[in-house]
Swiss-Prot record:
Catalytic reaction equation(s): L-cysteinyl-[protein] + hexadecanoyl-CoA = S-hexadecanoyl-L-cysteinyl-[protein] + CoA
Comment text on domains: The DHHC domain is required for palmitoyltransferase activity.
Entry GO MF terms: protein-cysteine S-palmitoyltransferase activity
Keyword match Membrane: yes
Organism of derivation: Candida albicans (strain SC5314 / ATCC MYA-2876)
Protein's recorded name: Palmitoyltransferase PFA4
Cytoplasmic side: 1-8, 62-161, 223-446
EC number: 2.3.1.225
Membrane spanning residue stretches: 9-29, 41-61, 162-182, 202-222
Length: 446
């Protein structure tokens, strides 16, 4: 779970003290007595790279949305002005999210239009407003208290280099300390006055601290690297965990069906199948007549497939395709740049952060044909205005007892009884106790 500090400046002071103590304390009290000058210079090079990458991770802006940024084909999207924004500077979508892009090459592909009232600008996909940095961050991963900065598209390479150099430096120091500990053990029968007591005390103090830093940073580095290889940020990993836990929730699928009806007006909800089957082709009849929009949207949200249940029976979370996973190699290059730039202090990512590339798998095999996340960003107003009218509150309060009794799998029953099954996106907490606010996301602006 993300650390919340009472005085944020401590998030930078504490790492600086630890880096200074480990690097220069170990060099002065221990290493200078045992390493050659060349080895000492190599060690100090590692320390210097730690400082450089740390400073860059702190001072590099994680990615600010361009002031003139506008979503593609925004002019063709139904947008209404708020009452006090008649000059057009504060455009908001008619709903909380609205269809913005349709890519003719791959069929109906779209993304949510989001407008940040605090930044007075549109939000690109994957961006979020940080409540601490007070800006919208491109491809926001999380707000890091130890850099007093967000980790986003532009400074993710610096952050990963910072972690990498710490692992390399503390790993090198750990090897030298282990050698000295073995040497002390082998000569433990010698008189005590022959040992350098200051050096011995330094080894006893520095070794556990160095191991703790090495192990904790290694775990964080591996976690971040796995996320990068998946093409996902920590926020998107959290989003996936939320969808996975709520996959059998009627509330989730009412939202998905409502969003589908809102974005693909006049088209019935598709028949969803597992990846082992072929999705049935559905003939879509375009309906240009707006009519009574609210009534039509409610009907599309609930009555597209009257013969089927709200929750698809042959469609699992494994059949859901994340739109920005381009494959391990492309994900690494987009996030960190080409390999020759990975160790360069000023290496930059290939992606610009506000025009994310869509994977071919998503274009070809996605069945829901909805933006990410499929149940939408803001859900409170939709639930109040639509879902409760269609019996969501009854489903939530009176769970189907016969269905629960028929479940024999303990893990499945435990998941179905999880109180997080029907909570809103803003209230969801994953197994590590993390919510959106723990990543620094401003929920009021998201």
């Amino acid at each position: 779970m993300a650390v919340q500090l009472k005085w944020p400046i401590l998030g930078v002071i504490i790492p600086c003290i630890i880096i200074f103590s480990l690097s220069y304390g170990s060099h002065y009290f221990i290493l200078r007595h045992h390493l050659t000058m060349k080895q000492q210079l190599i060690y100090e090079f590692y320390v210097t790279m730690i400082w450089i990458s740390y400073l860059l991770a702190i001072y590099t802006n994680p990615g600010r949305v361009p002031k003139n940024y506008k979503p593609s084909l925004a002019s063709s999207t139904r947008i209404e002005q708020t009452e006090d924004d008649s000059d057009g500077l504060g455009l908001e979508s008619r709903e909380d999210e609205t269809l913005i892009r349709e890519e003719p090459i791959s069929g109906d592909r779209c993304e949510w239009i989001r407008y940040c009232k605090k930044c007075n600008n549109y939000k690109p996909p994957r961006s979020h407003h940080c409540k601490i940095c007070q800006q919208c961050v491109l491809q926001m991963d999380h707000h890091c208290p130890w850099t007093l900065n967000c980790v986003g598209n532009n400074n993710l390479p610096h952050f990963m280099r910072f972690l990498g150099w710490i692992i390399w430096g503390t790993g090198y120091l750990m090897i030298q300390l282990i050698k000295l500990i073995i040497n002390y053990y082998e000569n433990s029968n010698m008189p005590h006055y022959l040992f350098n007591k200051t050096e011995l005390v330094a080894i006893i103090a520095i070794t556990p601290l160095n191991f703790f830093v090495f192990a904790s940073i290694l775990v964080l580095f591996i976690r971040c690297l796995i996320n990068i290889c998946k093409g996902m940020t920590q926020i998107e990993i959290w989003e996936w965990e939320r969808l996975e836990l709520q996959w059998s929730s009627k509330r989730l699928w009412r939202l998905i069906r409502f969003n589908y009806g809102r974005l693909h007006k006049g088209k019935p909800f598709p028949e969803l199948n597992t990846w082992t089957n072929t999705t049935n082709n559905v003939n879509y009849n375009d309906n240009d007549d707006d009519g009574d929009e609210d009534v039509e949207l409610i009907n599309l949200a609930t009555n597209n497939n009257e013969d089927s249940t709200i929750v698809p029976q042959n469609f699992t979370i494994d059949d859901l395709i994340f739109p920005y996973n381009l494959g391990i190699w492309k994900n690494l290059v987009n996030a960190l740049g080409y390999p020759y730039m990975w160790l360069i202090p000023f290496g930059k990512p290939k992606s610009n952060g506000y025009q994310p590339q869509i994977s071919q798998d998503y274009k070809q095999d996605d069945q829901l044909n909805l933006p990410w996340p499929p149940d939408g960003i803001r859900q409170k107003e939709i639930e109040i205005n639509v879902l409760q009218q269609q019996g969501y509150q009854r489903d939530r309060e009176e769970e189907d007892e016969e269905e629960l009794r028929s479940i024999r799998n303990y893990q499945e029953l435990r998941r179905r009884l999880d109180p997080r099954l029907n909570v809103q996106r803003s209230d969801f907490i994953n197994d590590m106790g993390e919510g959106l606010t723990d990543f620094g996301v401003d929920e009021d602006s998201d």
